[in-house]
Every structure is written in C-alpha cells, then in structure tokens.
Curated annotation (Swiss-Prot):
Keyword Metal-binding set for record: yes
Transit peptide: 1-43
Name of the protein in question: 2-oxoglutarate-dependent dioxygenase 21, chloroplastic
Cofactor or coenzyme needed: Fe(2+); L-ascorbate
Functional note: Involved in melatonin degradation. Catalyzes the hydroxylation of melatonin to produce 2-hydroxymelatonin.
Organism: Oryza sativa subsp. japonica (Rice)
Lineage of source species: Eukaryota, Viridiplantae, Streptophyta, Embryophyta, Tracheophyta
Top-level taxon: Eukaryota
Record's cofactor remark: Binds 1 Fe(2+) ion per subunit.
Amino acid sequence: MPAVAGSLYMASQHKGVPPPLPPPPRPLPVINLGRLTMDSASRALAVRDIVLACRERGCFEVVNHGISRSCMNGALEAASEFFQLSTERKEEFASDDIRQPIRYDTSSRDGISMSRSFLKHYANPLDDWIKFWPTQPPTYREKMGEYAVETQRVSMQLMEAILQGLGLGPSYLQEKLEGGVQFVALNNYPQSSAKKADKIGLAPHSDYGFLTILLQSSPGLEVMHHEDDAWTSVPAIPGALHVHVGDHLEVLSNGQLKSLVHRAVLNPNESRISIASIHGLSMDEEVHCAEELVDEHHPKMYRGSSFQDFLDFLPANMNRYKRYVESLRIDKP
C-alpha cells in the first residue's frame, strides 16, 4: 500500500531555533490562468510568465483558475471540522507508518513539525482513494473530493504550460501526469502564543513532487528566495492559490527550475489551516532529466528516482539537514 508522506525537511534540530524576523515585503508574481485558454498570443505570454516565475522565484500565485470560491471555502471548512473532532476520532487515522494510505499525526510525535497537526491522504484517481478518507465530518468526502478533482485539473494546466515553456511541448508526459500521484496534506497550526519563543510551525523544507498547489485560510506561509535566501511572507489572497516548484520538477528540468524552500510560521492573530495538494508521477514511475534538456554544455545533473525511492530515503534522513533533491545530484568530476 503506498505511503502518505510529503516533504523532506531541511532542519533536524528544532529546539532553540530563534523566532523568525518579519521578512521584507517582496511581491510574488500573480498569474491569470485564464490566459492559457485564450488566443495563442495570450497563451504564449502566460506560458512565458509562468516559466519565468518558476525560474526566478520558484513560486507564484494563480487567479482566474476556475475553482469556485465556494469549493475552496468548502475544503477549508471540511479541514477545520476534521481538526475539531475529538482526539479519539482523529486518532483512528494515527500511525507511525508512512506507508499508510491515510495518516494523522501531530508535532509531538512526527519529529518534523514544530507546532502543527496534519492529515495526509491520496486523491488521484479519486475513486481509488476516497474510500480511505474520513466519514466524519459528514461532508468531508464530498467537499474535499470536489476540491481535489479541481486542483488536479489546475495542476495539469500548469504542467502543460511549464513543459511547453521548457521546450518539451504541452503533451509531454501527459498520460503519466493524468494518472500520477496526487496527495493532499491538511495542516492545522495553532495561534502563536506570546509566551512561546518559537514561532515556527513547520521547519524549512522543499516538497517531493512536480508542483504543490496550496490553499491557506490566513497568512503563515513563507518562501525562501533563490538569489539571497531571504524569506518572504505569502499573503492569503482571497480566491488565489499558491503554487511552487517541487524536487522532481527540478530534476526533470535538469536544474533549470529549482525546488522552493518554504516554511510555516504561526499566526499571532488566529489559528491557521492550509491544504497542500502535491502532484507527481505514479508511485513506481521514475523521473529523469529530460533528454531534450541534456547536452555537452548542459550535462545531466540528477539521478532518476521514483516516489518509492523517496519513501525509502525518508526513514534514514528524516532528522538530517538534507533535502531529497540533494541526494539525487550527480557529483561533477
């Protein structure tokens, strides 16, 4: 049975980490996804903007993506209602085994989080996985299922644009992406306490897959800039989704795009819910550097790997200062 895992975290020791300083404002690119379905000139400009955002920032916000506000709010409500269930109900999904199809855990046990609880489960294809999902709250499967299907659609649009922008063509890997892994990670962060020195809810890390699409109820996500390692807070723009590059897109692009290091900080005003939808190929399908992006001037930079390889990597490296993509880099002679 495939595992419900997620990211490999950069920080191994969380005690004594100083509270983060407020990052300077540095607006993130905002992409109007509707331009992808307009005329060819509009699509070309949108493709250019998406790939540029991936190259320079590793992330962007998307608007006009076709997911209704009611669908997004419904998913956040379903997540919030799940975390409000009794401890006994939530513990039905608790497991130390990352190879479970659904898993609930808290920062007191998982050795990774600093202050959060989470529920992770698979979502694509929905008919294969929804039977593992919670039946409480009563509308969970309906609301989260609708949102999962919609984010899978958006991920396909984005991947087509990115692959086109890389010169690989919009249909590159299309069938494999359609049948690929999607897993949904629901995160619940408490309100920051004035007595608590450590304000970080989730340590710096990058995600495993091609793309992560994130919905957040309130600000708390921070992203690291490629050029200077500075942090920027990601606003919770009503109706917008946050998108960032994962480790396997860095591999596929042969290093043209870099996976985004990000973290979660506790909100001083309220508790926070986020829903991360992470997209990649199927469990055993290896991702390699695209041959079209490898030549004598651009040698292959990474080894191929699959999601199963990532799961094998996790147990021995969970608490080390290392990201998964770092283990895939080919040493230059």
